[in-house]
């Protein structure tokens, strides 16, 4: 009997929510949100990050001033232990999600690589 792919996706969603790295990420995010200075700095970082991504997607040039502002914010973030822990945990979870994505995409990869070899 074939499994419904959406049911499997919901199982995966639940597994991610129960993952220790995700639980730690939630705790780290709550700690950042509870500290006014950390929250403001994190919000500033996210705003800057989204602005730079938007510029790149629109084909606009990232200026030297943009780079300098980004470097200044990153330098301040590296001094904030709460944000640093949040970002490290997010990176670990991103690795897990990337691994899962590779597994999910394997049938397509095999299909297309078999087509190229034929």
From Swiss-Prot:
UniProt-listed Pfam families: Com_YlbF
InterPro entries with a match to the protein in the record: Com_YlbF, YheA/YmcA-like_dom_sf
Family: Belongs to the UPF0342 family.
Signal sequence, start to end: none
HAMAP family according to UniProt: UPF0342 (MF_01526)
Protein name: UPF0342 protein BCG9842_B4422
Domain of life where this protein originates: Bacteria
């Amino acid at each position: 009997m074939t499994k419904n792919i959406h049911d499997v996706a919901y199982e995966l969603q639940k597994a991610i929510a129960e993952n220790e790295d995700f639980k730690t990420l939630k705790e780290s995010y709550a700690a950042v949100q509870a500290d006014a200075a950390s929250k403001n700095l994190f919000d500033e970082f996210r705003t800057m990050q989204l602005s730079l991504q938007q510029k790149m997607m629109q084909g606009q040039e990232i200026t030297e001033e943009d780079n300098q502002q980004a470097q200044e914010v990153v330098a301040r973030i590296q001094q904030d232990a709460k944000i640093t822990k949040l970002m490290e945990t997010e990176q670990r979870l991103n690795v897990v999600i990337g691994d899962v994505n590779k597994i999910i995409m394997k049938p397509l990869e095999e299909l297309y690589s078999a087509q190229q070899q034929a």
